């Protein structure tokens, strides 16, 4: 199965749907779904996903290279792993999504969206994770969901972690730093993301990794993600990564800006970078007689997007943690 990406993009089902790799067995579970199981018993399970948004291609190309290394035998697999290419139709079309943003739909939230290929795919992915985790006895469960951002950023690579009732494990956070993430953002409330779903329902240590800017297939400079790719290779093969000399900065979400109607106005232009700072009292958005202002001494914006559909998030405001 060394043509997983090509088969997924073409919508083709392989003639052979299971087989042997170099020290592991593989099974094609459907378009964009591939399970790899080491021959030796392991107690670790990993979801490695990309392409939830179809225009975010660099992580997909990274996963393709990792799979090639596994199949060639140059990389050893020490995790039971499910590889997910989230939105095959959008990936093939080179667009963010075909109908609705799938990364708002998980945890059953797809039921509140108009039925579409994305709602059906979100449900399929939920079931795939349930089957994957229930069919093993993994002591350690990780989920790394690889993305790229629409906008530029003051931090080229950063991670967004879902709300979690328990403390984060230090080795997981340390690995994120070793993977080159310059900042970590901690959600304080539940959400419809893929990583929140895997964390809430299966207890996985989950993170959305934002790796640069969204570009079409073939236009990505993957060398700028070498540190992340090397950390992933080390993770898969069970090699300990060295601790980052510059630990990621930490932020927490303090508020969400939501667009409710066509009267909504976000006072940030297209050049506003992720993690741009705003001083206390700054007017961020207006909608009718409602005004959104900065309430802390300094807040930082993440994912500003004035053109989202009504009812969806138009941005997050963050506070820097000590």
Curated annotation (Swiss-Prot):
Active site: 210
Cofactor binding description: Binds 1 zinc ion per subunit.
EC number: 3.5.1.96
Keyword Metal-binding annotated: yes
GO terms of molecular function: hydrolase activity, acting on ester bonds; succinylglutamate desuccinylase activity; zinc ion binding
Keywords: Arginine metabolism, Hydrolase, Metal-binding, Zinc
InterPro entries: AspA/AstE_fam (IPR050178), AstE_AspA_cat (IPR055438), Aste_AspA_hybrid_dom (IPR007036), SuccinylGlu_desuccinylase (IPR016681)
GO biological process assignments: arginine catabolic process to glutamate; arginine catabolic process to succinate
Binding site for Zn(2+): 53, 56, 147
Pfam families (alphabetical): AstE_AspA_cat, AstE_AspA_hybrid
Pathway field: Amino-acid degradation; L-arginine degradation via AST pathway; L-glutamate and succinate from L-arginine: step 5/5
Keyword Zinc applies: yes
Cofactor(s) essential for the protein: Zn(2+)
Bilayer-crossing regions: none
Catalysis: reaction(s): N-succinyl-L-glutamate + H2O = L-glutamate + succinate
Function: Transforms N(2)-succinylglutamate into succinate and glutamate.
Family the UniProt entry places it in: Belongs to the AspA/AstE family. Succinylglutamate desuccinylase subfamily.
HAMAP family in the cross-refs: Arg_catab_AstE
NCBIfam families assigned to the protein according to its UniProt record, in alphabetical order: arg_catab_astE, PRK05324.1
Protein name: Succinylglutamate desuccinylase
Organism, as annotated: Salmonella agona (strain SL483)
């Amino acid at each position: 199965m060394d043509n997983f990406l090509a088969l997924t993009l073409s919508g083709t089902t392989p003639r052979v749907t299971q087989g042997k790799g170099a020290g592991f067995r593989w099974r094609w579970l459907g378009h964009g779904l591939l399970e790899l199981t080491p021959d030796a018993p392991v107690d670790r399970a990993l979801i490695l996903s990309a392409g939830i948004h179809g225009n975010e291609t660099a992580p997909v190309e990274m996963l393709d290279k990792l799979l090639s290394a596994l199949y060639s035998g140059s990389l050893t697999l020490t995790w039971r792993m499910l590889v997910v290419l989230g939105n095959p139709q959008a990936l093939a079309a080179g667009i963010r999504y075909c109908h609705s943003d799938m990364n708002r739909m998980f945890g059953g939230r797809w039921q509140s969206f108009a039925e579409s290929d994305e709602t059906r795919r979100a449900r399929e992915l939920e079931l795939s994770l349930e089957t994957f985790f229930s069919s093993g006895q993994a002591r350690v469960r990780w989920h790394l969901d690889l993305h790229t951002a629409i906008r530029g950023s003051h931090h080229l690579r950063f991670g967004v972690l879902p709300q979690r009732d328990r403390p984060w494990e230090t080795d997981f956070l340390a690995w994120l730093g070793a993977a080159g993430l310059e900042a970590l953002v901690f959600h304080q409330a539940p959400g419809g993301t893929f990583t929140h779903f895997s964390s809430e329902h299966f207890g996985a240590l989950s993170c959305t990794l934002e790796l640069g800017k969204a570009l079409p297939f073939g236009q990505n400079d993957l060398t700028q993600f070498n540190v992340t790719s090397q950390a992933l290779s080390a993770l898969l093969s069970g090699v300990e990564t060295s601790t980052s000399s510059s630990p990621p900065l930490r932020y927490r979400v303090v508020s969400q800006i939501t667009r409710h109607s066509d009267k909504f106005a976000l006072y940030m232009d297209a050049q506003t970078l992720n993690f741009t700072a705003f001083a206390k009292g700054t007017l961020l958005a207006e909608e009718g007689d409602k005004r959104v202002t900065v309430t802390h001494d300094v807040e930082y914006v993440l994912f500003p997007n004035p053109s989202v559909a009504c009812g969806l998030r138009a941005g997050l405001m963050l506070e820097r943690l000590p």
